[in-house]
Swiss-Prot record:
EC class of the enzyme, as a word: transferase
NCBIfam families linked: cyt_tran_rel (TIGR00125), nicotinate (nicotinamide) nucleotide adenylyltransferase (TIGR00482), PRK00071.2-2 (NF000843), PRK00071.2-4 (NF000845)
Organism: Roseobacter denitrificans (strain ATCC 33942 / OCh 114) (Erythrobacter sp. (strain OCh 114))
Taxonomic lineage from the root: Bacteria, Pseudomonadati, Pseudomonadota, Alphaproteobacteria, Rhodobacterales
Family according to the record: Belongs to the NadD family.
Pathways per UniProt: Cofactor biosynthesis; NAD(+) biosynthesis; deamido-NAD(+) from nicotinate D-ribonucleotide: step 1/1
Matches recorded under PANTHER family: NICOTINATE-NUCLEOTIDE ADENYLYLTRANSFERASE-RELATED, PHOSPHOPANTETHEINE ADENYLYLTRANSFERASE
Name assigned to this protein: Probable nicotinate-nucleotide adenylyltransferase
C-alpha cells in the first residue's frame, strides 16, 4: 500500500464519509458512530476533500480541516484521511474507482446525510456511484421527505434495503441503499462558519 494511505484487508467493510468538513463538528461524529452501528461496518474513513465541486467558495486550508477533524472524531474504528488529495481526485466517482482498484476485496459503503441524497442526482456520474457502491443514508432533521422524494431514490427505489435490515448493507451487492432515521445532533458547518467560529 502506498505511503499515507489507510490500511484495509480484503473482506473488510469500510464506510466512506466524504466531505469538506469545513469545519468538522459533533454532528459528523454522531452520524459516524450511528453508521458504524447501523450498517455493519468494520471501520469508517473520513475523506476530507480538497474542495467541494458543488460549493462556489473554497474551504479552509486542508491541514486546518484535517486537524479539526482529528480533534472532533476520536474513535478506534475511524480514520481521518486526505486520500482524495493523495489520489488527485475531485469527484466521488473517480475516488471510488481508484479506491476499488487499490483495495481489491474491500467492501466500500458510501455514507451520506439525507440532504446529500436529495441532491445526489447533481453529482458527477451519480448513477455509476449508486450502481457500484452501496449507499448508507442517515436522516437529518428536516431532510427526510426531500431525500425520499429525490430523483436518486426514485431511480434506485427497488435497490432500497429497509431500515430494519440495515446491518445487511455492508455486504450487499450494489445497487443497494438504506435510509435510516437516527436521533441527530443539531449542528452544521455552515452555521459554525456564519457565527464566526471557524477560519
Amino acid at each position: 500500500m502506498r505511503q499515507g494511505f489507510p490500511k484495509a484487508r480484503a473482506g473488510e467493510v469500510i464506510g466512506l464519509f466524504g466531505g469538506s468538513f469545513d469545519p468538522a463538528h459533533q454532528g459528523h461524529a454522531h452520524i459516524t458512530r450511528e453508521a458504524l452501528k447501523r450498517f455493519g461496518l468494520d471501520r469508517v474513513w473520513w475523506l476530507v476533500s480538497p474542495g467541494n465541486p458543488l460549493k462556489p467558495q473554497g474551504p479552509a486550508p486542508l491541514d486546518t480541516r484535517m486537524a479539526r477533524a482529528k480533534a472532533i472524531m476520536q474513535h478506534p474504528r475511524v480514520i481521518i484521511t486526505d486520500v482524495e488529495t493523495r489520489l488527485g481526485t475531485r469527484y466521488t466517482a473517480a475516488t471510488l474507482d481508484q479506491l476499488s482498484a487499490l483495495y481489491p476485496g474491500v467492501h466500500f459503503v458510501w455514507l451520506m446525510g439525507a440532504d446529500n441524497l436529495a441532491q445526489f442526482h447533481k453529482w458527477q456520474r451519480w448513477r455509476d456511484i449508486a450502481s457500484t457502491t452501496p449507499l448508507g443514508v442517515l436522516a437529518r432533521p428536516g431532510d427526510r421527505i426531500p431525500a425520499r422524494m429525490s430523483p436518486a431514490a426514485a431511480v434506485f427505489g427497488r435497490a432500497r434495503i429497509p431500515g430494519r435490515a440495515s446491518q445487511l448493507l455492508g455486504r450487499a451487492a450494489a445497487p443497494a441503499w438504506c435510509f435510516v432515521n437516527v436521533p441527530m445532533v443539531e449542528q452544521s458547518s455552515s452555521a459554525i462558519r456564519s457565527k464566526g467560529g471557524w477560519v
